[in-house]
């Protein structure tokens, strides 16, 4: 019997501190803080006007003070109930009014929303990139605005300027090569075609064109004798008279 009593006392001596530390103290702290939170609407005016709190009044109350505190609680309960009733009545009236008279769908666009537009764009791009990475998709490049036509540079001219040793005269000469196939002195005399390589099998009845076309003779201008500039041909075409044209036709027929 003595052993049983000793074992019970030993267990109680070990269990009671554990119960107090693990259960009683946390539970008391939770209840006390919950009570302070609930009594906050009463403690604020008491602290502002009387310099005390509800816990001090309860701890130091007498019979008279108890009735005073009880009266305060009654007023508090009545005011809460009265305010709740007023809120319910006005809420019901507003609900009936809105059901009868439709409320227009009008909203006010605040100006401060445009300040967050860049942040919203960045967040949308970041979220889209994260979703694409998680799905294993390739991230599409962000579309860039088209450049202004005034900022578009000429690629050919830039290529010539980037090459070492290229100057403005070289660029002008290279560009002009596409405009005039050949350059000859202005005082160069016009040469007639006496080469036998020309296969001109024309008759007198066929219309003869005294002006040689560069697109009809592929190898006609390969020698120095038969080389003629397009500019001189154009001048001859403008200045030649009918008699000159007849003489040229006769010379060409004799050369055959």
Curated annotation (Swiss-Prot):
Intervals, Cytoplasmic compartment: 97-256
> What highest taxon heads this organism's lineage?
Eukaryota
Q: Where in the cell is it found?
A: Membrane; Lipid droplet
Keywords of the record, alphabetical order, are: Lipid droplet, Membrane, Phosphoprotein, Transmembrane, Transmembrane helix
Q: Where are the transmembrane segments?
A: 1-21, 22-42, 76-96
Name by which UniProt lists this protein: Protein LDB16
The residue spans the entry assigns to the Extracellular side of the membrane are as follows 43-75
Residues bearing PTM Phosphothreonine: 180, 184
> What role does this protein play?
May be involved in protein-linked oligosaccharide phosphorylation since the deletion reduces the negative charge of the cell surface.
What other note does the entry give for this protein? Present with 149 molecules/cell in log phase SD medium.
> What do the Gene Ontology cellular component annotations say?
endoplasmic reticulum membrane; lipid droplet; mitochondrion; nuclear inner membrane
Q: Which residues carry this modification: Phosphoserine?
A: 241
Q: Specify the species.
A: Saccharomyces cerevisiae (strain ATCC 204508 / S288c)
Q: Phosphoprotein among the record's keywords? A: yes
Question: In what way does this protein cross or attach to the membrane?
Answer: Multi-pass membrane protein
Give one GO biological process term.
lipid droplet organization
Which residues form each disulfide bond in the chain? none
Q: What is the lineage of its organism?
A: Eukaryota, Fungi, Dikarya, Ascomycota, Saccharomycotina
């Amino acid at each position: 019997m003595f052993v049983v009593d000793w074992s019970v006392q030993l267990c109680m001596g070990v269990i009671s501190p554990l119960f107090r530390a693990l259960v009683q103290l946390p539970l008391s702290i939770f209840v006390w803080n919950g009570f302070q939170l609930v009594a906050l609407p009463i403690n604020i005016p008491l602290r502002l006007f009387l310099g005390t709190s509800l816990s001090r009044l309860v701890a130091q109350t007498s019979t008279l003070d108890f009735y005073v505190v009880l009266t305060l609680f009654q007023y508090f309960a009545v005011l809460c109930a009265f305010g709740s009733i007023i809120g319910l009545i006005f809420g019901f009236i507003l609900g009936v009014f809105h059901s009868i008279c439709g409320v227009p769908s009008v909203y006010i666009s605040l100006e401060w929303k445009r300040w967050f537009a860049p942040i919203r764009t960045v967040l949308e791009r970041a979220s889209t990139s994260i979703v694409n990475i998680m799905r294993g998709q390739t991230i599409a490049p962000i579309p860039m605005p088209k450049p202004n036509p005034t900022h578009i540079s000429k690629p050919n001219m830039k290529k010539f300027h980037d090459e070492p040793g290229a100057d403005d005269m070289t660029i002008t000469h290279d560009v002009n090569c596409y405009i005039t196939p050949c350059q000859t002195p202005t005082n160069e005399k016009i040469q007639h075609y006496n080469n036998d390589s020309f296969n001109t099998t024309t008759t007198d009845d066929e219309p003869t064109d005294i002006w040689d076309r560069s697109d009809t003779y592929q190898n006609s201008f390969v020698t120095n004798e038969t080389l003629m500039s397009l500019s001189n041909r154009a001048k001859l075409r403008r200045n030649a008279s009918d008699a000159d044209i007849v003489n040229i036709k006769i010379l060409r027929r004799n050369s055959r």
